[in-house]
Each structure stands twice: as C-alpha cells, then as structure tokens.
Amino acid sequence: MPHLAELVANAKAAVEDAQDVAALDLVRVEYLGKKGHFTLQMQSLRDVPAEDRPAAGAVINQAKQAVQEALNARKNALESAALNERLAAETIDVSLPGRRMENGGLHPVTRTIDRIEAFFGELGFSVETGPEIEDDYHNFDALNIPGHHPARADHDTFWFDATRLLRTQTSGVQIRTMKEQQPPIRIIAPGRVYRNDYDQTHTPMFHQMEGLIVDKDISFTNLKGTLHDFLNNFFEEDLQVRFRPSYFPFTEPSAEVDVMGKNGKWLEVLGCGMVHPNVLRNVGIDPEVYSGFAFGMGMERLTMLRYGVTDLRAFFENDLRFLKQFK
C-alpha cells in the first residue's frame, strides 16, 4: 500500500503543524475519527481478497499506531509548553510583602482574668485551682454554710447526688489550700462555677475569682486598702469606692464593695470580709493567732463594667462581630 505511507507522512506533517491542543484534535479527527482517512482504509478491506485481508489490516493498524504515537507526543509537547508559559506568567515576586494573616484575640473574660492575676501576682499572691465537681464539705460545710442555707437548694445548685455537686464558688480551693499549707497564705483562685440561673445578668456557668490572705495581724484595713488599689488599677481611674455591711457565712464582718459609676449611681463589683473564725478552725488554723480576709468577684461582671457590655450572655454566644471588638 504505497499510498498508505504517503497518508502517514501527511498525518505526521499535520501533527507537527498543529500549534495548540485544539488544532491537534482536529488532525486526530481528520485521520483517526469515525469518518477519517484510516477508517476509510479499514472499510476498503472489503475489496481485498479474503486471504490477503489479515496482512492488509495489520499494515493499516501499524500505520494508525504510528499516527497515534505522533499525536500523543505532540500533545505532550504542546501541554508542556503551555504549562511552562503559564508558570512563567505566574512567577511570584518574592520581594513583595506577603498577605498578612489575621491574628486571633483573647476573649474579653480571659483578658480580665489575666489583668487580675497580673495585679495580685505583683502583691505576692499565687494562683491556685481546684476541681469543678466538688463535694458538699468543701463547697458548704467547711465554709460555715449550714444545711438549711438557701444556697444548698436544688433551684440554686446543680447536684449529682446527695454529696456531689458542680461547685457554686471557688471557695473550696481556699479550704484545700489552708489544709495543705501553713500561714502565711496569699492566693487567688480563678475558675468556672455553676449556679442554676439564666437571664440577662446570670448564666448557669460563669467565671469567678476569689482571693485569700491568712497571716498574723491581718485587719479589715488591709482588706480595704488592697481592694481599693485593685479597683483603681483595674478600671484605670481613681474611683470612689464604698464598703457596705453585708452577710456571708464564711466571713465576719462582711461587706459588699461598690464603685461610683459615670452615671452617678453606685455599682456593686464584689463581696469580701474577714475570714470567719469557724472557717479557720475547720482547716486547723488557730483564729486566736491568725486572721485573714477573703474576697470574691465575678469575671463577667467586671468585664461588663469595664467594657460597657449590657448582656452577660453575649460572652458565651461566640458571635465574632462582638468578640472582634476586644482584639
């Protein structure tokens, strides 16, 4: 089949002349498609004597294979050239500044905890932690809270059984510390606490920070001076502060601390008092030798006052529009 060699030569020439993959595909269709030249060659085998058809068919298939190999080689070359051209056009200028990644930010309550820990750390306080699943002794009994006290009721406390509960305060950390350490003691105890309450100013879980000093000759004057300095530092202004007489089972005398707001109204910020002698006795400390003061404050409450947040629940909804304001 002399004309077959010419057909292969023409096909290879057309393949080499193709300048892109689309043009190359047209060559493939022209020569190898359903109506292509080589398909017509295969159809012409019907005119060849039966004994010669196998040999003639083999020759045509070899020719088709040669054209197919030429097509494949040219396609690879064109695709490689196109890739190199695209890569050259997309060359990265490494001297340009990169895209800056957006940094995350601390949660506003975490910021408050860090600020308070830093302040009291400079006064020699250490940070202590304790279990969130507490027993009634450390959460109530050791703190001079009797069995009939309203805080023990189911509507205020999450109980697991008759003796285990989710702690309602971090005061249990103070009890454990006083049992394990001898005075002088200076600690703060931050952590999550739980109470069965949910509204605009209360959530079932919130963060509390309690502080404790036990040493010889500790007086209410020491308590007032420490908390006054703390509040001025935290709110970054010279505040008008007042101590109102109050009642807590674990302190005597007890007080609630208010600061004067910008609207001319008093705002409650924390509770405090001198450690009750019964609490000291419960942990094996002689109240005739040692005295101390304790204070407790809600982290969300202080954060709301510092940043002007009106709904405590916003701290737990993970709304980025809200949280990004504190970055």
Swiss-Prot record:
It is found in: Cytoplasm. The keyword Glycoprotein does not apply. One of its GO terms (biological process) is phenylalanyl-tRNA aminoacylation. GO terms for molecular function: ATP binding; magnesium ion binding; phenylalanine-tRNA ligase activity; tRNA binding. Gene3D superfamilies: Bira Bifunctional Protein, Domain 2. It catalyses: tRNA(Phe) + L-phenylalanine + ATP = L-phenylalanyl-tRNA(Phe) + AMP + diphosphate + H(+). Belongs to the class-II aminoacyl-tRNA synthetase family. Phe-tRNA synthetase alpha subunit type 1 subfamily. This is Phenylalanine--tRNA ligase alpha subunit. The lineage of its organism: Bacteria, Pseudomonadati, Pseudomonadota, Gammaproteobacteria, Enterobacterales. The gene is pheS.
